[in-house]
């Protein structure tokens, strides 16, 4: 009996930890930039040039700072130290995510097995696949929006495969 209870407690703790690595779908369902579509990726997010699409569409720092404080409170994180989070676009700008819609921004933990660094790496892989025509923009957006950790495991493998 005691062994079974221990098992379920460990499962519950694991699920709680995992939940903080993924955005709350009610607070951050993701939002798209209407300028970017499957039909124009070569002219938008995949266009070669001095500046990337992401660099040209970053929201102002003041917007991110304001949103960061609001989102940490909305998420109810017990650790309110903003240095422990990265304001992350659930659907990255490099995949046509909205730069300024709060529904696309969440405070992603930096200190975690599934840290912001890992999601950033996945974003680069998905962007490359979209630009090479290996997957559609819509597929990449859906996969990262529904569960970016599952997408990471699908395209990269276990968390220890990349720092």
What feature does the model see in each segment?
Residues 2-5, 9-85, 94-163:
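Nuclease and nuclease-like effector domains acting on nucleic acids or nucleotide cofactors
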